[in-house]
Amino acid sequence: MNELEFVTKHRRHLHQHPELSLHEFETTAYIKAFLDSLNIKYDCPLETGVIAYLEGNGSHTIAYRADIDALPILEENDVPYRSQSDHVMHACGHDGHTTALMLFVQRCKDMQDAGQLPQNVVFIFQPAEETGGGANRLIKAGAFDKYPIEAVFGIHVNPFADEGIAVIRDEEITASATEYRFFLTGLSSHVADKEQAHSCGEALQHVLTQISQIQQFHLNGLKRNIVHIGHFKAGEAINTVPSNGYLEGTIRTYDIDDLTIVKNQMHKIAESVKLLFNVECEVKFAEGYPPTINSPKLRTQIEDALIKADLNVYDKPTPFLFGEDFSFYGQQLAPAYFVFIGTRNEDKGFVTGLHTSHLNFDEKALINVVNFYENLLNNYKEV
């Protein structure tokens, strides 16, 4: 089959069989079977995900990463290859990322068989990008200890950029993503005896107000930050004073100092609630993803490889405000660079955003990704 047939076949199979983070068992088996068909050795440091390796002629080792997990979303696309899993969908394009890396593996194996693979290549089929921090898990498991990786590259489909456009940015390209949760415990009473209670309802109102003011009064207005309240609840019945309260949300920032400011303010809010309302209040933070930092040292190689792949380069002036665990590779493993590949096509109706029930794209965009990957490999220079 030709390459367009290859990416169409594999991407649509993966699209029909999405799996959630840390449960990508069938996806992992599918990738392993593909690698076995090429007689390529691989490791599985975690229960899901695969790390493959090909030895080239050069002394350098570079890595390429694709995430393989899906989202808990009910697909609404009316296509023959729609998800066969109830309320699970590849709504972030990871089926495309995985397919592109599979085709790149095929090309690299062909080059190796011909004695023309220029450098050593590590292929990272990574689980749990959406939740679970799969990149960090792999690094902590020692998955890359035996590879002297010098650079890590990755891509993400971007339905807000037209086909044929590649979006890049040096330094911060995506924000940190940190979840926070407030837990309030007070004393309930009948509403007729509310003076005897310690109301978590009133306390929660205070928390809501104070959180909403963090962005306005404590963060630089020229920087892009999000302090989002996603869900809150107090009490159980209409005629009782709430004895409990709960609030959760997410923080998005590309500046670690700003994240520290937000966390400190939230701790102060929790302490103020205790004093003002005589209720217990605790704030907890889930381990988030740090900002994805693109190494400027790799910029020239990235841009040249994209242009040679017939992609138009757009230099984004500000970072995206969503999180991405590719960030761990640049933070802990090696200089890294993350590129967004445009997939928007209004004529074909491919216009909806990531994490939506109608996300779709033309598989031919994946050929450009593989051309970009190959150009990077053929012209790689140590940084």
From Swiss-Prot:
It comes from the Bacteria. Its EC number is 3.-.-.-. InterPro entries: Amidohydrolase, Bact_exopeptidase_dim_dom, Peptidase_M20, Peptidase_M20_dimer. Keywords: Hydrolase. It is an enzyme of class 3 (hydrolase). SUPFAM superfamilies: Bacterial exopeptidase dimerisation domain, Zn-dependent exopeptidases. The keyword Hydrolase applies. One of its GO terms (molecular function) is hydrolase activity. The keyword ATP-binding does not apply. Pfam families: M20_dimer (PF07687), Peptidase_M20 (PF01546). Belongs to the peptidase M20 family. This is Uncharacterized hydrolase SA1230. The lineage of its organism: Bacteria, Bacillati, Bacillota, Bacilli, Bacillales.
